[in-house]
């Protein structure tokens, strides 16, 4: 029960962070491209690499905290469903280059950031 409560609490924090951070990004850059979703997914990709590698290489994070941060906070922060919907809407609106850019940037940059999170922890070891 402790783990489930931790996940729920962290998920709420991640969801609120996504709401405010993506809203702020859209306020800065506009909504012509799904910048807000891309930014939160990039941040989440880096952080999950960092947290998982830290959890595997040290005792700094308890299993409950690691699960709360990854399943809860990162699960609430990042969103594949919004990425899918926004990409579909770009395609539907005939914005093929923007849709392709979103897919390429989301996949490539998020994979790169996950790797950077892992490398960050490994460089500290």
From Swiss-Prot:
Reactions accelerated catalytically: fluoride(in) = fluoride(out)
Cellular localisation: Cell inner membrane
Domain of life: Bacteria
Notes on how activity is controlled: Na(+) is not transported, but it plays an essential structural role and its presence is essential for fluoride channel function.
Family: Belongs to the fluoride channel Fluc/FEX (TC 1.A.43) family.
Main location: membrane
Gene Ontology terms, MF aspect: fluoride channel activity; metal ion binding
Membrane-spanning ranges: 9-29, 32-52, 67-87, 99-119
Keyword annotations of the record: Cell inner membrane, Cell membrane, Ion channel, Ion transport, Membrane, Metal-binding, Sodium, Transmembrane, Transmembrane helix, Transport
Protein name (Swiss-Prot/TrEMBL): Fluoride-specific ion channel FluC
One of the protein's GO biological processes: cellular detoxification of fluoride
Transmembrane helix recorded as keyword: yes
Organism of provenance: Trichlorobacter lovleyi (strain ATCC BAA-1151 / DSM 17278 / SZ)
UniProt function note: Fluoride-specific ion channel. Important for reducing fluoride concentration in the cell, thus reducing its toxicity.
Membrane topology designation: Multi-pass membrane protein
GO cellular component, one term: plasma membrane
Residues at which Na(+) binds: 75, 78
Keyword presence, Lipoprotein: no
InterPro entries: FluC
């Amino acid at each position: 029960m402790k783990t489930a409560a931790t996940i729920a609490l962290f998920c709420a924090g991640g969801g609120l962070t996504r709401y405010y951070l993506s809203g702020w990004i859209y306020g800065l850059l506009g909504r012509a491209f799904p910048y807000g979703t891309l930014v939160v997914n990039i941040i989440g990709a880096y952080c999950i690499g960092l947290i998982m590698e830290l959890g595997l290489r040290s005792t700094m994070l308890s299993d409950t905290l690691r699960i709360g941060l990854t399943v809860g906070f990162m699960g609430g922060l990042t969103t594949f469903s919004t990425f899918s919907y926004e990409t579909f809407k770009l395609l539907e609106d005939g914005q093929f280059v923007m849709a392709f850019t979103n897919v390429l940037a989301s996949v490539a940059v998020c994979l790169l950031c996950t790797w950077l999170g892992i490398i960050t922890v490994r460089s500290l070891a």
